[in-house]
Amino acid sequence: MEGPGATCYIQVCYRFPSASHPDFFPLSVLDSLLAGPSNLNMFSGGISNKTSRLYRALVDKEYVVSVHGGAQATIDPFMYTITMTVHPRRKPEEALAALDKEIQRVKEQKVTKEEITRAIKQARALFAYGSENITNQGFWLGYAEMFANYNWFETYLEKLSAVTAKDIQQVANEYLKPQSRVVGTYVPQEGKS
């Protein structure tokens, strides 16, 4: 897509299972590892962090100026999205190639125990922060009933902590396939309004 402006954006969408699917938890850890943990409800985004793989591979190397990932807990299968703001000195194809290279790396090389521990810790912290008061706990219990049941909320941290490197590699290969994604690119046309 082309239009007025000076900034190029890319959004990549992969299919993502429902929150009650067993693959949801390894994919949530993979999201935390790649882009920083997501706030799993539809009303909030995730956080970007400088320790994530995509930040180091794309922002630090100046392919993009920002990268965010996002997954939502839903009753039906939905999407996992990665949104990038392309660096002004780069072409969108370069940013997408760098993203693909990093995704291929997680598919082929086992994630280290340290990375998994950090990713789970970050996802746990975001979940704890999002459910620290009684209002948010009530929201999560009700929201969990919509897509699974209240037990999902009560066992979320336990299931997250059980994710292994093998689980992450398996879901990366299953869900992050180039042929199973949609890529949208906004290419600015400076001088047009």
Give the predicted meaning of each segment.
Residues 1-20, 130, 185-193:
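An aromatic/glycine/proline-enriched structural segment found at the starts
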Residues 3-5, 72-79, 149-151:
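Short, flexible turn/loop "capping" segments at secondary-structure junctions
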Residues 5-9, 53, 62-64, 77-79, ...:
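Extracytoplasmic
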Residues 11-13, 35-86:
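A structural supersecondary motif
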Residues 12, 28-30, 58, 82, ...:
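Buried hydrophobic packing residues in well-ordered domains
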Residues 13-20, 41-44, 81-90, 103-110, ...:
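Second-shell loop/turn segments in exported
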Residues 37, 48, 72-130:
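M16/insulysin-pitrilysin zinc metalloprotease superfamily fold
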Residues 83-85, 106, 114-193:
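C-terminal regions of mature proteins
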